[in-house]
Amino acid sequence: MTEKKEFGRSGNRDGSEQRNDRNNRSYGERREDRGSSFHNGKRDDRGSSFRGGKRDDRRSNFHDGQRDDRRNYSHDGREDARNNYERDGKFSRGDSDTFKGKTGFKGDAGKPKFDRKQREHAGGEKRPRTAANLDPRQIALETLLDVSVREAYAQLALEKRLKQSRLDARDTAFITRMVYGTIERRITLDYQLDQIIEHDGEIEPVIREILRMGAYQILYMDRVPDMAAVNESVQLTRKMKMGYLAGFVNGILRNLIRKKDELVWPKPEENPARYLSIMFSAPVEFAEMLIDEFGEHEALEILKFRPQKNYESIRPNLLRCDEARLRRLLNDDEFEYESGKVDGTLRVYNAGDMTKLRAYANGLFAIQGESSVLAARAVEAKPGQTILDACAAPGGKTAVISEMMQDTGRVYAWDTHAHRVRLIKGTAERLHIENIRPAMRDAAIERPTMQETLDAAIIDAPCSGSGVIGNKPDLKYRISREAVQSLCKTQQAILNAVSDMVKKGGTLVYSTCSIFKDENEQQIRSFLSTHPDFYVESITSLLPDDLKEHETPYGLQLFAHRDDMDGFYICKMKKMDFVSVK
């Protein structure tokens, strides 16, 4: 088999292959720059940077996103003669939890087409629609309801809906952008709709999401004609068996088209947190937390950041493929790529869904963000050791550690949910790694029988996910002071339990994908104050030159907007070997 064929698309097209990690994934071209002027009234026809797949590099209680991409929307421009009317429906409006405008409409908180050569690898023609398939906008709506009403994670909800739908790449890309664009701008859309709706009361969640979707297309998707957005929204209302509200939806969206240039935006000097909340669609409390910790300017930079170029971060599975071979495979299929900031990683631009490539299915490479790779390498695992990945799913960091150990010794990989343990197993099987021992275990529980049995452990702790909101926009609606306080207690319990399992002279790495000190530096300060047998060890030798200056005596804090990597915290600690102390 030639290398080119090995890198081609695999025959598995049902999406059953789970992505092994979760970092810098971005589909579509970048969004509009929302610079310091904060002008947010411009349409956004340049895609977005949400990235998908199940990935390990952004572990959080709030994870799971999927990527999105641009699509040629010209076929959506058809007019429906049945909808050639306009009236303002009388309907009650929904309670929500973010803003109260004069009308009370308060916010509650794909994959791109492969290029020609990649489509050839896929084989076969476009899969025909079946009776089981829904209209793309209906799938997007159901996914949004999964997230806003059923409190599902966007990534998981979207993956499930797309797998059931069996749509082609074009519709998949459209659905993904619609879902993530609407989630990303939820509060902003509600604020805009708030200025149009003139009715009090409660709005059904279905209608609220249809209005958000319609407003997103009208205000931020230039390739969808305004009237097509209206007509499709009206039809969607009918498909959801709520035709009696079709006139209401029609009237609101038509009024939005007429008045979109007259929308009023808040002024930053009046209420900075509310301003950031509306302009960048973040809950007020989250905006306040950012301002309190980083100041207004830095909070703005954190909320507005989007990658300049969208890419997929990958690394070779060193047990089966070196970097030189991976580069040859990419060259053969004419991928655009460059070296990542972290040694041994590559950034592949306009990558498409790389989980469909045969080389991925054969375990030649892993999709994993550079911050995640860096955290795993901080363990500095050696062959023959016994190591614990305490919060391992779906196994990206576990795999890096196993590769450093040359598939010898033993790596315990724990997670608290059976389905996440299955992801770890899937990652190990795909990468052909044999020294991983997945198990459903709660790392916060003390285990006297394992005391001082580990050469090293890594805790990629459950966290707020505040460092990766650009890729997983649904996470920001879950962030609050109360949530962070609860997470800190969990993190502390895991640190206490796992540290007892580390041998004297052993290594303990703590990481999160958060940017809040309470979850990071303060957590380590507190831990060290009660565990004097541990001390922080520098990881400067592992860092790219431009990151070395950011390491502190209490670890390394990465920021997406500053460092061009996922927001991450990494702290390496060593347990003192008292025997060697004189």
Model regions and ranges:
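S-adenosylmethionine
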Residues: 1-582
